[in-house]
Amino acid sequence: MDAVAAEPVSSSMAGLPAQLRDLGQQDYAPVWRAMQRFTDAREEYTADEIWVVEHAPVFTLGQAGKPEHVLAPGEIPVLQVDRGGQVTYHGPGQLVVYPLLDLRRLKIGVRDYVCKIEQALIDTLDEWNIVAERRDGAPGVYVGGAKIAALGIRVRRGCTFHGLSFNVAMDLQPFHRINPCGYQGLQVTSVLDLGGPSGMDAVKAVLLDQLARQFGLVLQPTSALPDLSLPA
């Protein structure tokens, strides 16, 4: 049984329990493979989980990703992955959240799932009086036309993996090496650049609370990490 590291994160309603795992700073590939294994091994009564991580610098190309949108990767590795969407960048100072949820148990569809994630991000930014919005046909969250959070998801047998990336206090220069999400010239921004906090912990706490509210979850933090080994 996993050791509980802290009290459950509060939610506005009693809800379904979900394990919360803070992975710290990790390379992308081991976490990607771990969430694939978790999703493949899920059974009807497997508890949902939410993983939180900061990744080492990496560009990822989703299933719709076109190599020509990677303009000048330089020393930053490029990985083709199995999420939806185009190309994006992950790096230190960006909060990445992977909700591993059973949509059938939550009784929501994929469209509602995406909308709930976007609303959690919008409500998180409102904590610091940052007015954000969603765009029809372009998943993610935007402030004044600049993208501050990207979504890239995969659903297998009704269960989600991959998730969201939220620019908190990071070097945005690598985004100039790609066409973010497949859009040439798309501007990006961060919480810090918009007058919000620089600390990841402050933003993380608010976002997790908002996600718990949107999905009706009671988050149960655990110190146990998933198996992050890579296949031989």
From Swiss-Prot:
Its main location: cytoplasm. Substrate binds at R83, G84, G85, Q86, V87, T88, Y89, H90, A150, L151, G152, G163, L164, S165. The active site is at C181. Keywords: Acyltransferase, Cytoplasm, Transferase. It catalyses: octanoyl-[ACP] + L-lysyl-[protein] = N(6)-octanoyl-L-lysyl-[protein] + holo-[ACP] + H(+). The keyword Membrane does not apply. The record marks K147 as: Lowers pKa of active site Cys. One of its GO terms (cellular component) is cytoplasm. Residues 44-219 form the BPL/LPL catalytic domain. GO terms for biological process: protein modification process. It is found in: Cytoplasm. GO terms for molecular function: lipoyl(octanoyl) transferase activity. Its EC number is 2.3.1.181. InterPro entries: aa-tRNA-synth_II/BPL/LPL, BPL_LPL_catalytic, Octanoyltransferase, Octanoyltransferase_CS. It comes from the Bacteria. Pathway: Protein modification; protein lipoylation via endogenous pathway; protein N(6)-(lipoyl)lysine from octanoyl-[acyl-carrier-protein]: step 1/2. In the reaction, the free carboxyl group of octanoic acid is attached via an amide linkage to the epsilon-amino group of a specific lysine residue of lipoyl domains of lipoate-dependent enzymes. Belongs to the LipB family. Catalyzes the transfer of endogenously produced octanoic acid from octanoyl-acyl-carrier-protein onto the lipoyl domains of lipoate-dependent enzymes. Lipoyl-ACP can also act as a substrate although octanoyl-ACP is likely to be the physiological substrate. This is Octanoyltransferase. It comes from Xanthomonas axonopodis pv. citri (strain 306). The gene is lipB.
